[in-house]
């Protein structure tokens, strides 16, 4: 089993390294195109390219002596040396109607098989199949086999065979034994798979750690597939897809898993649904297929949205931050179309995560509103339920993460489709103590002014019972403001413009100061704790 675990890890790390290579290759190609357009004066085309890729390509520049024209010239020279003729780069296009009907090429996919109308490359040998080399040893083995075959053909023909042209202008000589001795040696050889796997793990991990491809996983620099390859020539779908694409989260929230204090069960389930299926797809098949829906419910300010920000930062997925204003339209029929386009775009950009915040505003119980429910709202809810059913029956890596402060108002059909329902409760005493220590450390100098504290964290953790994480942050901020307010009078009375400001020295924040702030800052959702616990007993799914 140990060997199998190592093999899974190797496959995961190699897949991550290959994804980094592909991402870097696509980004480098777009930067080369942008550089060429700007160099040739195609300013409007360069601006359109920058808007469609959703990243600022002008922040990057090509290296010295590298441009698109030089790369094309070098390829033509290489092709001529290898095949004694220049490559055919372009061909006459089809008529306009046929070209519109043809499907655009999927972005990010490398297609090696050419069309039948394109002139193929000359065949080197009828029985030889060329593959992309993966290491330097391939060149030595392949060159040695070709040298042996040429030597045997010369001996059979009496040395009168015509001289073959060198592929790249290099003469390669064999350094190993004859083929017969080599075959006997290979039959006696014992292959140490364990050492091979360990070497592969070490090389892959070093490659990823060194980040030699300059591929930063920052969401703001991630390439987004062009919408044109998804919608084709339908103008209505293009407009709806553009509306949804604006909610693809490209900023970096800079929230890590370790930054979230507590919420261990929620973090574990999110990793099971988003992170692990991408890293170890061999494990998530059949009955072990990943979760498609997760509901985070609990009092406001307990970290539900913060957990979604961690997903956007840590998980290498396309993150759709959807609100009610995105998928609700005043025009008849547009709401359900927006929902359908949302899920189709999520499949197109897979792996992806759809985050629905304040879910009760979109999926409240049907037929319970005063005066009956509007027809458009009912159709939109039905379409959302149908699309989530389609996710459950497919193998697409699309995950729905929903958050709600009022789970008892959600439609029961939506609860069934959200397979996991996690209560994000008020923090425990240990979590509250860690939060206070995080926001008010003994010494902090982040704003340029040194602030010192002398707090009994254990006592304050017990005194803040019923406070949410957001409430505790508010209390810490108010406690830190108390010594700052004392120096406002001195700063306002300093009228001389030529004299320097006096040295600012803030008083130490003590435990008594913190307790005084607690007396005037009450928790926001303490009264709802029992209601959440009662709903959890009836609908919990962990």
UniProtKB/Swiss-Prot annotation:
Location (main, coarse): cytoplasm
Biased composition (Polar residues): 114-126
CDD domains on file: RecA-like_VPS4-like
Coiled coil: none
Keyword Isomerase in record: yes
Entry's localization field: Cytoplasm, Cytoskeleton; Cytoplasm; Cytoplasm, Cytoskeleton, Spindle; Cytoplasm, Cytoskeleton, Spindle pole
Annotated Pfam families: AAA, AAA_lid_3, LisH
Positions contributing to ATP binding: 298-305
EC number(s) recorded for this UniProt protein: 5.6.1.1
Gene Ontology biological-process annotations: microtubule severing
Keyword annotations from UniProtKB, A to Z: ATP-binding, Cytoplasm, Cytoskeleton, Isomerase, Microtubule, Nucleotide-binding
GO cellular component, one term: cytoplasm
Reactions it catalyzes: n ATP + n H2O + a microtubule = n ADP + n phosphate + (n+1) alpha/beta tubulin heterodimers
Domain LisH: 25-57
Known role: Severs microtubules in vitro in an ATP-dependent manner. This activity may promote rapid reorganization of cellular microtubule arrays.
Stored HAMAP family: Katanin_p60_AL2
The name this protein goes by in its record: Katanin p60 ATPase-containing subunit A-like 2
């Amino acid at each position: 089993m140990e060997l199998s675990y190592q093999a899974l890890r190797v496959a995961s790390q190699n897949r991550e390294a290959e994804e980094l290579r592909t991402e870097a290759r696509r980004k480098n190609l777009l930067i080369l195109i942008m550089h060429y357009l700007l160099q040739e004066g195609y300013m409007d085309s360069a601006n359109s390219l920058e808007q469609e890729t959703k990243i600022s390509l002008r922040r990057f520049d090509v290296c010295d002596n590298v441009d698109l024209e030089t790369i094309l010239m070098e390829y033509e020279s290489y092709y001529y040396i290898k095949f004694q003729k220049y490559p055919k780069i372009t061909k006459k296009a089809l008529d306009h109607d046929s070209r519109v009907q043809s499907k655009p090429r999927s972005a990010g996919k490398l297609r090696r098989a050419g069309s039948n109308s394109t002139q193929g490359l000359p065949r080197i040998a009828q029985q030889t199949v060329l593959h992309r080399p993966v290491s330097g040893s391939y060149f030595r083995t392949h060159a040695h086999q070709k040298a042996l075959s040429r030597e045997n053909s010369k001996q059979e023909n009496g040395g009168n065979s015509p001289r073959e042209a060198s592929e790249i202008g290099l003469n390669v000589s064999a350094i190993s034994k004859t083929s017969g001795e080599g075959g006997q040696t290979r039959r006696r050889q014992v292959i140490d798979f364990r050492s091979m796997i360990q070497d592969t793990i070490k090389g892959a991990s070093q490659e990823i750690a060194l980040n030699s491809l300059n591929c930063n996983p920052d969401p703001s620099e991630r390439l987004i597939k062009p919408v044109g390859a998804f919608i084709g020539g339908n103008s209505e779908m293009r407009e709806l897809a553009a509306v949804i694409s604006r909610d693809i989260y490209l900023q970096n929230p800079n929230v890590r898993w370790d930054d979230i204090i507590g919420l261990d069960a929620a973090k574990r389930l999110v990793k099971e649904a988003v992170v692990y299926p991408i890293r170890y797809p061999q494990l998530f098949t059949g009955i072990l297929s990943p979760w498609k829906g997760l509901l985070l419910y609990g009092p406001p300010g307990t970290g539900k949205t913060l957990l979604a920000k961690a997903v956007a930062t840590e998980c290498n997925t396309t993150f759709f931050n959807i609100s009610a204003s995105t998928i609700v339209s005043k025009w008849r029929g547009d709401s359900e179309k927006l929902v359908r386009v949302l899920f189709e775009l999520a499949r197109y950009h897979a792996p992806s995560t759809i985050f629905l915040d304040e879910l009760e505003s979109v999926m409240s119980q049907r037929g319970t509103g005063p005066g009956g429910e509007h027809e458009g709202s009912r159709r939109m809810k039905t379409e959302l339920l149908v699309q989530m059913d389609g996710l459950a029956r497919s193998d697409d890596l699309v995950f729905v993460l929903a958050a709600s402060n009022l789970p008892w108002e959600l439609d029961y059909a939506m609860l069934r489709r959200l397979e996991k329902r996690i209560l994000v409760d008020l923090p425990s005493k240990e979590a509250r103590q860690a939060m206070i220590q995080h926001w008010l450390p003994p010494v902090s100098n982040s704003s340029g002014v040194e602030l010192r504290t002398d707090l009994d964290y254990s006592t304050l953790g017990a005194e803040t019972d019923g406070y949410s994480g957001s409430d505790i942050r508010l209390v810490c901020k108010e406690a830190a403001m108390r010594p700052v307010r004392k120096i406002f009078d001195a700063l306002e009375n300093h009228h001389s413009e030529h004299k320097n400001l006096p040295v600012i020295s803030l008083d130490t924040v003590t435990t008594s100061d913190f307790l005084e702030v607690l007396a005037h800052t009450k928790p926001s959702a303490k009264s709802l704790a029992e209601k959440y616990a009662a709903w959890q007993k009836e609908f919990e799914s962990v």
